[in-house]
Amino acid sequence: MSKVFVIDHPLIQHKLTLIRDKNTGSKDFRDLVKEISLLMGYEVTRNLSLQEIEIETPVGVTKSKVISGRKLGIVPILRAGLGMVDGILQLIPAAKVGHVGLYRDPETLEPVEYYCKLPVDVQEREIIVLDPMLATGGSANATLKAIKDRGVANMKLVCIVSCPEGIAAVQKAHPDVDIYVAAIDEKLNDHAYIVPGLGDAGDRLFGTK
């Protein structure tokens, strides 16, 4: 079973309160989502492997550590996941960025992939999947499957706000994928919105209805 990490750093929780507020405008919402993503990225990358190298400083030679091993990739789920990309890239600017787009079939209500563009060497990378909201888990599960189908074995899912239903759905479908969240909210309502949540993250990021 995958692990769930709740990142409850005071700065994240403060900024989370601001994005929950219905009076927060799109610009501030975008800035805050970026800042929260950056802060979450610190914990998401905590277990990256290191190797020791020798470098020369202005006053001598020393051994120091750098990140080694598997390369990283970032895959936002379109469109709301785009709001988290820049924050993660500030921490790992060398990461490649792919994209997965989904729409909901009006008859089956199941997510359908309409776009998937991943780095050519995606099989060699550890992939961080980004989506501000983990509600039913349908979009996350479809995205994780799409990436796995293209040969990726190592992934993490990073969401800002989640709920028990979404977490359970991802753990059932993808027990090998760890989940990182800033909050686990109470439940889903009858319209599949997280309660208390923060509304539609995509609409609030981009000022659409």
Curated annotation (Swiss-Prot):
Coiled coil: none annotated. It catalyses: UMP + diphosphate = 5-phospho-alpha-D-ribose 1-diphosphate + uracil. One of its GO terms (biological process) is uracil salvage. Keywords: Allosteric enzyme, Glycosyltransferase, GTP-binding, Magnesium, Nucleotide-binding, Transferase. Allosterically activated by GTP. It holds the Pfam family UPRTase. It comes from the Bacteria. It is an enzyme of class 2 (transferase). 5-phospho-alpha-D-ribose 1-diphosphate binds at residues 79, 104, 131-139, 200. InterPro entries: PRibTrfase_dom, PRTase-like, Upp_B, UPRTase/APRTase, Ura_phspho_trans. Binds 1 Mg(2+) ion per subunit. The magnesium is bound as Mg-PRPP. GO terms for molecular function: GTP binding; magnesium ion binding; uracil phosphoribosyltransferase activity. The keyword Nucleotide-binding applies. Pathway: Pyrimidine metabolism; UMP biosynthesis via salvage pathway; UMP from uracil: step 1/1. Uracil binds at residues 194, 199-201. Transmembrane segments: none annotated. Its EC number is 2.4.2.9. Catalyzes the conversion of uracil and 5-phospho-alpha-D-ribose 1-diphosphate (PRPP) to UMP and diphosphate. PANTHER family: ADENINE PHOSPHORIBOSYLTRANSFERASE (PTHR32315), URACIL PHOSPHORIBOSYLTRANSFERASE, CHLOROPLASTIC (PTHR32315:SF4). HAMAP family: Upp_B. NCBIfam families: PRK00129.1 (NF001097), upp (TIGR01091). Belongs to the UPRTase family. This is Uracil phosphoribosyltransferase. The lineage of its organism: Bacteria, Bacillati, Bacillota, Clostridia, Peptostreptococcales. The gene is upp.
